[in-house]
C-alpha cells in the first residue's frame, strides 16, 4: 500500500548523515520559490497568516532558495510537527526507511510530492496558500491532477491499489480524486471524553504519523491489516467507523498512560 502524510510548519535542521534523493518535482519547487520570492514580507504574512518575524524568515529563505546556503536535509527527518512526533523517522531502521522510500509519500505545497529521503531546503509554503502562478490563483490550481497521477505511477510500481490517507484535509485536497486510480482509506482517531468520543487535533496528527510508521514497519499490504493498529493505546472502534474511514479510539486510561 501507499501512505501519504502532510508536511510540517516546523523544521529540524540538524545535520543528518544520510544519503538523500532528488525530489521528482524539483523544477516546480524552484518555479514556486521564484514566485514567492517576488512577494514582499507583508504579502507573505497575508498569504499564510503568519507573524511578521515568520514572514521575514521565509522571505529571506525564498531569496536564497536556489543557492541553498543552509544546505538540504532528508524530508522525513527535517519536518518536525505533530505528525512527525508520531512517525519518529529518526528511529526507523535502514530496511524500513528503504521500504518507506517506495511506500510513503509526503504532500508539500512547494515540492508537490516527496519521498522520505528526498532532499529539501528550508521553506514554509502551505498547500492552502493562494499563491498566484500562470496556472491559476492557488497551489491547488498549480498542481492540478499531477500529484494524483504521480501516486498512480508509484502505486503501480509497488503493485497496490490502496492509498492510506494520513494527511490533513488541506493537503489531501491537492490530490485530484477524479484522477486517482486508487482506493482511499482515511483513518480517523478519537479520544474518549466525558461527553463522548472526540477528535483532538494534536493527538490525531500524532496518531496519523504513528499509523504511517505502523504501515511501513509491518510492511502492510491490505487495508484490513491497519485495524490492528494499537500504538499509543488506540484500538479499532467499529461503531465510529464508516466505509473507507476506519476509526480508532483511545480510552481515558490510555490517554493518561501515554
Curated annotation (Swiss-Prot):
InterPro entries assigned to the protein according to its UniProt record, in alphabetical order: YaaA
GO CC annotations on file: cytosol
Pfam families per the UniProt record, alphabetical: H2O2_YaaD
Example GO BP: response to hydroperoxide
Source domain of life: Bacteria
Family matches, as HAMAP family: UPF0246
PANTHER family hit by this protein: PEROXIDE STRESS RESISTANCE PROTEIN YAAA, PEROXIDE STRESS RESPONSE PROTEIN YAAA
Protein family (similarity comment): Belongs to the UPF0246 family.
Protein name stated in the entry: UPF0246 protein Jann_0444
Organism this protein belongs to: Jannaschia sp. (strain CCS1)
Record lineage: Bacteria, Pseudomonadati, Pseudomonadota, Alphaproteobacteria, Rhodobacterales
Amino acid at each position: 500500500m501507499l501512505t501519504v502524510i502532510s508536511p510540517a510548519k516546523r523544521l529540524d535542521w540538524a545535520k543528518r548523515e544520510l544519503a538523500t534523493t532528488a525530489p521528482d518535482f524539483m523544477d516546480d519547487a524552484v518555479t514556486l520559490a521564484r514566485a514567492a520570492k517576488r512577494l514582499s514580507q507583508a504579502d507573505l504574512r497575508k498569504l499564510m497568516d503568519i507573524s511578521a518575524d515568520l514572514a521575514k524568515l521565509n522571505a529571506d529563505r525564498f531569496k536564497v532558495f536556489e543557492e541553498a546556503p543552509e544546505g538540504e536535509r532528508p524530508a522525513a527527518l527535517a519536518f518536525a510537527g505533530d505528525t512527525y512526533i508520531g512517525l519518529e523517522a529518526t528511529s526507523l531502521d535502514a530496511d524500513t526507511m528503504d521500504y518507506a522510500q517506495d511506500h510513503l509519500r509526503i504532500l508539500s505545497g512547494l515540492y508537490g510530492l516527496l519521498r522520505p529521503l528526498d532532499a529539501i531546503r528550508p521553506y514554509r509554503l502551505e498547500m492552502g496558500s493562494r499563491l498566484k502562478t500562470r496556472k491559476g490563483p492557488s497551489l491547488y490550481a498549480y498542481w492540478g491532477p499531477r500529484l494524483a497521477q504521480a501516486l498512480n505511477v508509484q502505486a503501480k510500481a509497488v503493485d497496490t491499489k490502496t492509498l492510506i490517507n494520513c494527511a490533513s484535509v488541506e493537503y489531501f485536497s491537492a490530490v485530484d480524486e477524479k484522477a486517482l486510480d486508487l482506493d482511499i482509506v482515511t483513518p480517523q482517531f478519537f479520544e474518549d471524553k466525558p461527553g463522548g468520543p472526540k477528535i483532538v487535533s494534536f493527538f490525531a496528527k500524532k496518531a496519523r504519523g504513528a499509523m504511517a510508521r505502523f504501515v511501513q514497519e509491518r510492511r502492510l499490504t491490505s487495508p484490513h491489516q491497519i485495524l490492528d493498529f494499537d500504538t499509543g493505546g488506540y484500538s479499532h472502534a467499529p461503531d465510529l467507523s464508516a466505509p473507507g474511514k476506519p476509526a480508532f479510539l483511545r480510552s481515558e486510561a490510555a490517554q493518561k498512560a501515554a
